[in-house]
A protein has these predicted regions:
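A glycine/threonine-rich phosphate-anchoring loop and its flanking beta-alpha core
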Residues: 1-44
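C-terminal charged capping/lid subdomain of soluble metabolic enzymes
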Residues: 25-27, 125-179
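Short alpha-helical scaffolding segments that buttress acidic/His motifs in well-ordered protein cores
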Residues: 24-28, 56-67, 81, 113, ...
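Small-residue-rich helix-loop
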Residues: 107-115
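Oxyanion-binding "anion nests"
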Residues: 45-99
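Short glycine/serine- and small hydrophobic-enriched flexible loop segments
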Residues: 93, 114-122
């Protein structure tokens, strides 16, 4: 564990738009997994506008820190931090294959969050309005990607290799709702 962490939001102004959005995917994830009121703030804080980054960063750091401190060995609740990552890692890996345009980690996780939100709704854990809200925000921020039918099989192969899986089944992090 680090002794301290230094964060200066001023450096965000030096990032290309694509990298800023990549990092913002983790902010979205923190709101979705932990705090509905934070989600409402995120809905009104477009990352390319004049967002006040300091409270956003403080809230995301506090959420992640509280989860990690509550479950330092990732035996239980900390797994919620994997939301969007099972599918996201597979999408990111696929984007690096065969001359495709590589996706950033955040772009891939954003796709994964939409997919895992859809799975959450299908399992009757999340309502349709929340799924729609998540989908609308993410698709408004991130470039649309189209996957071919043949990619589905490759994505499943890649998901099967995920370190979080147990007993040859793919593990997803599903949400009961926003926050």
């Amino acid at each position: 564990e680090p002794l301290s962490v230094f964060i200066d939001p001023v450096f965000l102004s030096t990032l290309p738009t694509r990298e800023l959005l990549s990092g913002f995917a983790e902010v979205i994830k923190h709101a979705l997994i932990a705090d509905k009121s934070y989600w409402e703030l995120i809905l009104n804080s477009h990352p390319l506008g004049n967002a006040d980054w300091e409270p956003i960063i403080q809230k995301s750091v506090a959420i992640k820190q509280s989860i990690v401190e509550a479950d330092p060995t990732e035996k239980g609740f900390r797994k919620v931090l994997n939301f969007g990552h099972t599918i996201g890692h597979a999408v990111e890996s696929l984007s690096l294959e065969g001359g495709r345009t590589p996706l950033t980690h955040g772009e891939s996780v954003a796709i994964g969050m939409i997919c895992e939100s859809y799975l959450s709704e299908r399992k009757r854990k999340m309502n349709k309005e929340e799924l729609s809200s998540i989908s609308t925000l993410i698709t408004s921020l991130y470039e649309h990607r189209v996957f071919e039918d043949m990619d589905t099989h490759r994505l499943i192969e890649l998901m099967k290799n995920d370190k979080k899986n147990k007993d040859d089944s793919i593990s997803f992090t599903l949400l009961d709702g926003i926050g």
